[in-house]
From Swiss-Prot:
Signal peptide: none
Function: Required for maturation of 30S ribosomal subunits.
Claim: Transferase is one of the keywords in the record: no
Stated family: Belongs to the RimP family.
Pfam short name (any one): DUF150_C
NCBIfam families given in the database record: PRK00092.2-1 (NF000929)
Keyword hit for S-adenosyl-L-methionine: no
Descriptive protein name: Ribosome maturation factor RimP
GO cellular component: cytosol
Listed InterPro entries: Ribosome_maturation_RimP, RimP_C, RimP_C_sf, RimP_N, RimP_N_sf
Transmembrane stretches, start-end: none
Taxonomic lineage of the native organism: Bacteria, Pseudomonadati, Pseudomonadota, Betaproteobacteria, Nitrosomonadales
One GO BP: ribosomal small subunit assembly
Keywords: Cytoplasm, Ribosome biogenesis
Length: 143
């Protein structure tokens, strides 16, 4: 079982979404990024998750020196199909594993997701991108 698979149900059970996990060298820093459907992540949210995860990680004998829990930020990563559905109509920066039309990097508006294919409006062109071809995707914050 991966660390993501271990933490996701626990965090979901507390009413939050596990967005991403970052680990530095084994046993060092563990960063957990959380979000919730309504409102913003607060310091109290991070403290509650941190306290709960500290106990879970101890029980599961997961070695780490420091645990950081935070929001994913305004430029939130998009990882799952549900992320793309949730942020439909928003602007995103996309990097592909394999080039599409000779290009790997795109900026555009998320139009729709059907059958694991994302439609992105990039400069007026509708691109069909398979979700499995995504290397990295992040929201572009509205400032």
């Amino acid at each position: 079982m991966s660390l993501f698979e271990l933490l996701e149900p626990t965090i979901a059970g507390m009413g939050y979404e596990l967005v991403d996990i970052e680990q530095s060298a084994p046993g060092r820093l563990l960063r957990v990024f959380i979000d919730k459907k309504e409102g913003s992540i607060t310091l109290d949210d991070c403290v509650a998750i941190s306290n709960h995860l500290s106990q879970l990680l101890a029980v599961e004998n997961i070695d780490y020196n420091r645990l950081e829990v935070s929001s994913p930020g305004l430029d939130r990563p998009l990882k799952k199909k549900a992320d793309f559905v949730r942020y439909m109509g928003e602007s995103a920066r996309i990097r592909l594993r394999i080039a599409l039309q000779g290009q790997r990097n795109f900026v555009g508006t998320l139009v729709e997701v059907n059958d694991d294919v994302l439609t992105l409006n990039a400069d007026g062109k509708l691109l069909q991108i398979e979700l499995r071809n995504l290397e990295k995707a992040r929201l572009i914050p509205k400032l």
